[in-house]
Structure formats: C-alpha cells, structure tokens
C-alpha cells in the first residue's frame, strides 16, 4: 500500500524536494510503473491539501476513506444483484463472507492495483448478474467497460476475470430468448 502512496504523495505535496517521496520504480531512469494509477488516486489528497487547512496526513486518511466507500458501494451493488437475480439465501452467504473475511477488510482500503481491481470486478459482476434480455446493450456495455477499466487502470492480468462473462455472452447468451446461437 505504501509503495503506491509515495508517488501519490509526490504528486500532491509539492512544497519542495525534501518533503515529497520518490521511489526508484517511478524515476525516469527506470520508469517501470505508469503514473496513471498514482495520478488517478492523487485527486482526493490534492483536493484535501489545497481546499482545507488540514495537515497533510489527513489526505492519507481521506483517500483511505474514499477507497472504503468505493469498496462498500461495489460490494453492496453486487449483493443487491445477487439477491435480485440469483437467490436471497445466496446473497446472505455472500454478505457474511464479505463481512467477516479479514483479507477483504484489509484490501478494501489498500492503495493497490489489486484492490482497485477488486472494486471494479465486484461492480462488473453486479452488472453481469442482470439477465441478458432485460438490459439489452447496457448490461454488455457496462460490464465490459468496468472489466476493461479495472484491467487497464489497475492490474492488466485481471482481464481474465471477465472470461466467464465473455463465455456467457458469446456462447450461452444468458437467458435471452431471442438468442440465435442456441
């Protein structure tokens, strides 16, 4: 988590070279990581440090709060869609597992690409739970866009998580009665 906080801190704390952190992965000499992920997360700390008179460490906690809200919203949407389109009992089990799993709690506020992919995967799966025939193009577009955004902005290897959805769209057509492939 803190390895990604350092470039965010560098982007938001521009008081001088002595106050900002910099890691070797982001130095132009090596440049093995993209600044896009850090820049995307630097918006909240930047606004906190510029708009308020709070100390710089408040930006750290504000960003973690925003990450917790994103995780909670994506998991709540997934729970709602599982309850609506799968079964209420399955949704209750999902809720229990999401609530008591220590790894999920720890990952929900971590500034890591894998945690970001966790949010986008939960959100994409919430869209994918909707029956294919009820949302027409929106289900396909939103699910594909969120899976792609998670892979492009977070962790590229996470695109494999979309494989079951892609298989359903291409081969099974969900529950769409007008599907010509069946």
Tell what function each PLM region has:
Residues 2-29, 36, 40-51:
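Extracytosolic helix-loop segments that constitute the early lumenal/periplasmic catalytic or substrate-binding loops
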Residues 4, 10-13, 71, 75, ...:
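Hydrophobic core segments of transmembrane alpha-helices in multi-pass, intramembrane catalytic enzymes
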Residues 31, 35-39, 50-73, 107:
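Loop-to-helix entry region of an early transmembrane alpha helix in multi-pass inner-membrane enzymes
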Residues 41, 45-49, 75-83, 102-105, ...:
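Hydrophobic transmembrane alpha-helices
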Residues 61-89, 123:
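Transmembrane-helix motifs of polytopic, lipid-linked glycan transferases
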Residues 94-102, 147, 151:
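Short helix- or helix-capping micro-motifs
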Residues 106-117:
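Short acidic/glycine- and proline-prone juxtamembrane loop motifs at membrane-interface regions
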């Amino acid at each position: 988590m803190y390895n990604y906080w350092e470039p965010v801190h560098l982007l938001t704390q521009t008081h001088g070279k002595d106050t900002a952190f910099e890691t070797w992965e982001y130095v132009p000499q090596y440049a093995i990581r993209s600044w896009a992920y850090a820049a995307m997360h630097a918006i909240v700390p930047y606004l906190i440090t510029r708009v308020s008179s709070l100390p710089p460490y408040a930006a750290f906690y504000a960003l973690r709060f925003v990450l917790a809200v994103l995780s909670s919203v994506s998991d709540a949407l997934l729970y709602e869609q599982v309850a609506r389109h799968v079964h209420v009992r399955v949704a209750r089990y999902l809720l229990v597992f999401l609530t008591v799993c220590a790894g999920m709690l720890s990952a929900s506020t971590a500034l890591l690409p894998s945690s970001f992919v966790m949010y986008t995967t939960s959100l994409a799966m919430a869209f994918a739970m909707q029956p294919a025939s009820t949302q027409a193009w929106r289900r396909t577009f939103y699910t594909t866009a969120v899976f792609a955004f998670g892979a492009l902005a977070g962790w590229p290897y996470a695109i494999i998580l979309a494989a079951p959805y892609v298989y359903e769209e291409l081969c099974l057509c969900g529950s769409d009665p007008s599907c010509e492939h069946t």
